[in-house]
């Protein structure tokens, strides 16, 4: 499985008086089983990029390939793509609507045309995977806590068995404990299923200890694409675009400078 973007551009409001060039010549590849952090401040293009990945937005120019097929080919099945590349929007609990958590999670598989038994089996598996307490399965989703609602919404996408799961700011609005619980859950889920996960965030601190690769977006361009250690080495450049490296980076840099100073004193 792979997603490949080749020189992708996206322009909002093309032909109007309010044009915004949201993506500028973005090229990258996402491989099977990766856990990727997609980082950038508001307006950097990261949310637009996620919607390009699963076909919700069509690139103004450039090409997107999924498993070797160009998704912009005339006969390409976009519905199938969106079931294979699952996108959990920011504040996904706003999309909960059924009378019970279980029914809500069944909604996606049902829309795929699966029979009742398969829908229910997938819902059970997905809810267990996100760590939802069984006694809450048949409660109203509106009675859940913020973190529980977030788990239910994520389960609704997982139940469609995507090959790629994109989470847009999954910890937004949660307290520190809720944030850690959601990120720990996502990490455990990735390890258990080997599903490709793309975690979208504006916080380096949130993703530093979870992902194996970081994409940094700035002003519509892919600024960095590397393992966390190499990306964080550019902490001064990151600061200039409003992003702070994890605290441990600054501690390491300070320690290195201190040792260098001590060494120079003994020379």
Report the location of each language-model feature.
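Conserved ABC ATPase signature
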Residues: 140-144, 148
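Conserved ABC transporter NBD signature motif
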Residues: 62-73, 81
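Conserved ABC ATPase "signature" region
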Residues: 117-135
């Amino acid at each position: 499985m792979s997603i490949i973007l080749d020189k992708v551009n996206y322009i909002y409001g093309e032909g109007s008086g309010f044009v915004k060039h949201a993506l500028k010549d973005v090229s990258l590849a996402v491989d099977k089983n990766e856990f990727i952090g997609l980082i950038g401040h508001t307006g950097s293009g990261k949310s637009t990029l996620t919607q390009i990945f699963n076909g919700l937005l069509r690139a103004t120019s450039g090409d997107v390939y999924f498993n070797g097929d160009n998704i912009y080919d005339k006969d390409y099945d976009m519905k199938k793509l969106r079931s294979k590349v699952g996108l959990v929007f920011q504040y996904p609990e706003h999309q909960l609507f059924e009378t019970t958590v279980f029914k809500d999670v069944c909604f996606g598989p049902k829309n795929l045309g699966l029979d009742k038994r398969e829908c229910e089996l997938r819902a059970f598996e997905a809810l267990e995977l996100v760590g939802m307490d069984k006694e809450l399965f048949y409660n109203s989703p509106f009675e859940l806590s913020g973190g529980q609602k977030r788990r239910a919404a994520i389960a609704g996408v997982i139940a469609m068995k995507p090959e790629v799961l994109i989470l847009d700011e999954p910890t937004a609005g949660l307290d520190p404990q809720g944030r850690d619980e959601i990120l720990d859950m996502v990490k455990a889920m990735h390890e258990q299923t080997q599903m490709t996960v793309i975690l979208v965030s504006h916080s380096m601190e949130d993703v530093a200890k979870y992902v194996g690769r970081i994409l940094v977006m700035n002003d519509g361009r892919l600024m960095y694409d590397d393992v966390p250690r190499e990306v964080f080495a550019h902490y001064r450049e990151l600061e200039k675009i409003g992003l702070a490296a994890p605290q441990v980076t600054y501690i390491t840099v300070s320690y290195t400078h201190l040792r260098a100073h001590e060494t120079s004193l003994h020379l």
